[in-house]
């Protein structure tokens, strides 16, 4: 018949056996990619420094998703938290990857079988002898099975009854580990940052899915509704399936970009809003005030700040700083973080403490301005030195370091002070190794940014796909001139094609 490339999928439009076959092959490809990608990431992943070189800095994409649902050990003898392991068991990172690859192979064989044996008695109506699918019943079966899976995940896997639990951490991403979670049945379960909501919502949604599946298995749709929504046409299934997928894609884009209990910052990196709102900076200041209240010295107080917390408070970990089309991991941008230099405290010659104004997310360059505690500009690095009033040299700015590698160091040389003032624009100051990976110094986004961009883009494309296929199935008689009640079955690939003279137009 000579179908153009953009219409080749119509060969399975009226062929249930081969429709199953291509779906099996698609699932085989997805599962095979997941397993292969996991093995590739495990081959290049360095688990030695979970604090300064975590998975999201290294550009891992599959490993964070495995980790958040309870996989934490490797056959290589390491645990994602930095400890060592002697008995990882079968459900290690490598075990899960291998399971996906084995599943992919079995699905591949099943796809071939269904392609060869496409004309099964299962697809024929006993009353008429013609091939037909009971789509409402199939919908009920799928709904029931997905409900069972959803319920089981929430009731057993997440709660630890039969499974490891999920990744749980504190609000600042410091103490994360895999542990069981109790369902949250109160109003707190609707807080996107409460892990208990993951368990309770899966249980509730699973029960709803099971009940809805049983309903659709036992109750037939009214004839008018059946005809109005073209429930006998498999393109209706395609349209509604695309709707479910694009809706889910939009939802997970939001939970990833804005943050949630399901997207921990230890696995996917911080969100941009945590930089914009000074989220980690405020927590650090709170800890400093508590330390000062105990009459500890600044050096002692800052030495107590976890390096992990300080590292979050650095603009290079902001997923919105990396351009969407800058390929590579964060480590390929500013480099591999080696150590925290400590907190830089600036003062002018009058002894006033000065604070460097931090760079906003969407700036590549930003003027170096130092303000006092009341927000009054006291020093800067001027663009035009001839007109400057507040230059570091004129104001006599010095910098002292507390905590970190430069603890106790003090600098008054203007060139050195300006160097650290520029770096303080970017948050806490860290030393980076840019030689190992030949890092180019240009910020990259984290997997949080890639995931959001990809899922938002595909959700938009799938939205148009839903409109397209929904319109095609609802207005088939208008677009193709084919009677919507036509149930004739002919050779697969030669039915209801636009411009195909062999297709019957009217029901006899």
Curated annotation (Swiss-Prot):
Pfam families: PSII. The keyword Transmembrane helix applies. Keywords: Chlorophyll, Chloroplast, Chromophore, Membrane, Photosynthesis, Photosystem II, Plastid, Thylakoid, Transmembrane, Transmembrane helix. One of its GO terms (molecular function) is electron transporter, transferring electrons within the cyclic electron transport pathway of photosynthesis activity. Belongs to the PsbB/PsbC family. PsbB subfamily. The gene is psbB. PSII is composed of 1 copy each of membrane proteins PsbA, PsbB, PsbC, PsbD, PsbE, PsbF, PsbH, PsbI, PsbJ, PsbK, PsbL, PsbM, PsbT, PsbX, PsbY, PsbZ, Psb30/Ycf12, at least 3 peripheral proteins of the oxygen-evolving complex and a large number of cofactors. It forms dimeric complexes. GO terms for cellular component: chloroplast thylakoid membrane; photosystem II. It is a multi-pass membrane protein. This is Photosystem II CP47 reaction center protein.
